[in-house]
Amino acid sequence: FWKLKPTEELYDLSADPDEVNNLAESSTHQDKLKELRKAQQDWCREIRDLGFLPEGEIHSRSQGTTPREMGLDNNTYPFETIFAAASIATERGEGALPQLKKNLGHGDSAVRYWGAVGILNRGMAATAASRDELVAALEDESTYVRVVAALALGKFAKEADVRRGVETLVELSNWSPQMDVFTSMAALNALDKLDAKAAFRLDAIKSLPRGGGASPHGRYNGYVKNLVGKTLSDLGAAPGKKK
């Protein structure tokens, strides 16, 4: 379920209610694909969909107002710019790599985030070609950019950069009054995806706080504890579990 998905999916729900046969590449379904693609994009534009922001940025950008009001303000949410960056990131063409690297230097953090996501989605070759940009992104002012850059390096880079990525993710997983819950959740999810590559920081992961950090609402607070437990379990180090 959590594996990388196709850029687009199209199903004939009458003939294929279980959505097994993806028709997005079918030559006989291209007109319908284009029709539905336009409908989906038009709807995103009409509602100025906030889902193109990392969850924590929805909260940080809407401080002093509501998410809806923030989303209607092009100064706080330049929708078309961010939407274009997300669209490029979720395509698979290698020809987009120069633009993705350029997006990593953009002034808006969400555009930088999608630049990093696009490189991550393209795997080892794209990560190697973007190594310098990703290492620089480990110091980005946006923690969400840092998480994705660290995951790309941790997953696809050479050993020294894998260690850089893991160290960054452990640091960002440290939920505290200075580290918001959404950053810690994103970093812990990324650590969990690295599996054994994160094992050299097992003791640090064991000591991560499970509560007490910055959070806009208590309903989010249980996730950090669960994610730490899941990561430790996958590393064979959950309480009471034999290695």
Predicted regions located by residue number:
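Long, internal low-complexity/basic segments
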Residues: 1-7, 13-15, 23-132, 136-169, ...
